[in-house]
């Protein structure tokens, strides 16, 4: 999927009219039927089936909040299939509306800016369940998983559930990550996909439980490991390109500690600094081909990278300073490509400069618990996004090296450290 990008100056981008808020629309049965039909070929190709648990507790016309884990674009097609004919609105990243706002609103999408404070979103969700009498589909992770495990959830999810005061449904997919992991560059694998849809919290549960209890129930449901699931269930991924781009996730060598020297190609992951070579097996495990393996499980390697980043932050050694190509989004008409600059990140937060000295944006670590980061964003390139309600800045690292995963890890760990320091007083 591509996106409309227009070259212009930074001043021209700022002069764009701001986005005007519009209330969500209830998707028509015709649109829902068309979307379901359009989703059928991909689902048939994956031999898709869905197990439903406890759904009899929720009436067919009763609005509910549907939470779903986020592995790949197939997730939306799965939701369309398993929820039909229940009408629902979909919380969607605002850049997904660029160049096609009418269509996105017609199918029931609600725009929001990822990892930005957005009180309007809650009001829109309330409007859906109370006025439109529709359910709301929300991907609380707000981004695709890098390593096949759950990404951080917002602590505000429990408050949102209490405000909506409707039942909560969970859709958990199996095999979707194995079919199309984000790091693999949109290359589809042959993998069967299934889902489990269950009533996570009934109306009485929502009414009787406090925010902390609701959070615990939801957070518990979002504990998963797709690589472990693949191994334990004997799911074979035999494609010869299955390790392509794995260096985007496993960017640091655990043997020589070099960063940005890993290369994922074919079925192998090789460190171009020390020569250590791993093979990503058909069952998703790692096998070292020239020595003892430091890790045999992709998420374990990624967790180690997170620990390394945290240690750098605690010691004051962490710093990112890279040249970037900069795009902006002010409204949903287009993405504005405004020039080049530098993105700096350290314990004080993000600092983006560029466009001949005209752009100077600073974002504190406490601004968000995570970071909007993506691989091959709309087929343009790997991307880091910062910004606020006025504008979003999409930064595309230049000059090689895999920095996207590390920067997201650093943003998440820095947020935790700042919160802990504040709690200590």
Residue ranges and their predicted role:
Residues 238-292:
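Cys/His-rich short segments
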Residues 265, 344-348, 380:
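Structural motif
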Residues 277, 334-336, 356-361, 388-402:
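Short, surface-exposed beta-strand/loop "edge" segments at domain boundaries and coil↔beta transitions
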Residues 367-425:
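Acidic, Ser/Thr- and proline-rich intrinsically disordered linker/docking segments
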């Amino acid at each position: 999927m591509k996106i409309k990008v227009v070259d212009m100056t930074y001043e021209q981008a700022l002069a764009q009219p701001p986005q005007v808020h519009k209330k969500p629309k209830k998707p028509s049965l015709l649109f829902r039927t068309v979307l379901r039909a359009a989703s059928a070929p991909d689902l048939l190709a994956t031999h898709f089936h869905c197990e439903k648990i406890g759904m009899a507790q929720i009436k067919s016309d009763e609005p509910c909040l549907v939470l779903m884990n986020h592995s790949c674009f197939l997730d939306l097609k799965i939701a369309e299939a398993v929820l039909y004919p229940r009408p629902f609105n979909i919380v969607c990243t605002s850049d997904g509306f660029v160049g096609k706002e009418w269509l996105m609103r017609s199918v029931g999408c609600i725009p929001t800016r990822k990892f930005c404070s957005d009180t309007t979103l809650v009001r829109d969700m309330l409007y859906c369940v109370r006025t439109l009498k529709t359910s709301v589909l929300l991907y609380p992770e707000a981004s695709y998983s890098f390593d096949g495990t759950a990404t951080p959830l917002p602590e505000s999810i429990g408050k949102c559930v209490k405000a909506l005061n409707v039942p909560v449904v969970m859709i958990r997919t199996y095999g979707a990550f194995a079919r199309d992991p984000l790091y693999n560059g949109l290359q589809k694998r042959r993998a069967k996909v299934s889902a489990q849809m269950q009533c996570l919290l009934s109306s009485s549960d929502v009414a009787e439980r406090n925010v902390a209890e609701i959070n615990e129930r939801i957070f518990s449901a979002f504990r998963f490991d797709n690589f472990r699931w693949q191994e334990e269930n004997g799911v074979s991924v035999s494609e010869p390109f299955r390790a392509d781009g794995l260096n985007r996730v496993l960017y640091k060598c655990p043997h020589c500690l070099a960063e940005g020297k890993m290369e994922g190609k074919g079925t192998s992951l090789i460190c171009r600094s020390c020569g250590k070579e791993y093979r990503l097996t058909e069952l998703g495990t790692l096998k070292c081909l020239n020595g003892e393996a430091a890790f045999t499980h992709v998420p374990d390697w990624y967790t180690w990278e997170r620990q390394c980043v945290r240690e750098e932050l605690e010691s004051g050694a962490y710093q990112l300073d890279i040249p970037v190509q900069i795009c902006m989004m002010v409204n949903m008409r287009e993405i504005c490509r405004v020039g080049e600059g530098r993105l700096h990140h350290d314990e004080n937060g993000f600092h983006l400069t560029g466009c001949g000295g005209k752009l100077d944006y600073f974002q504190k670590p406490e601004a968000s618990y995570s970071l909007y980061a993506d691989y091959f964003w709309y087929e343009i390139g790997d991307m880091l996004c910062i910004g606020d309600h006025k504008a979003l800045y999409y930064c595309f690292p230049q000059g090689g090296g895999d920095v996207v995963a590390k920067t997201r890890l650093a943003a998440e760990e820095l947020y935790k450290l700042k919160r802990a320091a504040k709690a200590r007083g």
